[in-house]
C-alpha cells in the first residue's frame, strides 16, 4: 500500500470516528493530533524544512485554539489554568518556530502528554455523568 493510500485511509478513518464521537473522545483525538503535529514540527526543524515546519506548527496552533474553545471557563480555576497553559504552549511553539529550536517542542510535548494522561484517566462513569449533564443543558 502506498503512502498516499495510507494517508487517505487514515484521514477517512479519523473522519468516521469524529462523526460518531462524543465530546470527550473529540478532545482526546485533538490532543493526540497535537502530539503528532508536534512530532512533525520537530522532524521538520531537524531537517531545516521551513515549509513543513510552518505547516505543522500552524496545525498545532489551530488545535490549541480548538482546545481553548472547548473549555467552559464558568467552572473556575481548572479551565482557567488550562486556558493559560495553552497560551503558554502557543508562545513556546512560536519560540521553536522563530529559533528553529526543538527544545520548546519537547517542553510543549511533555505538557500536553501530562494533560492528556489526566484526560485519559477520567473514569467512564464520570464521563457519562458529564455527557448527560451537557446534553440536558
Where are the regions that the model predicts?
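N-terminal intrinsically disordered, cationic/polar leader segments
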Residues: 1-40, 45-47, 52-57, 65-71, ...
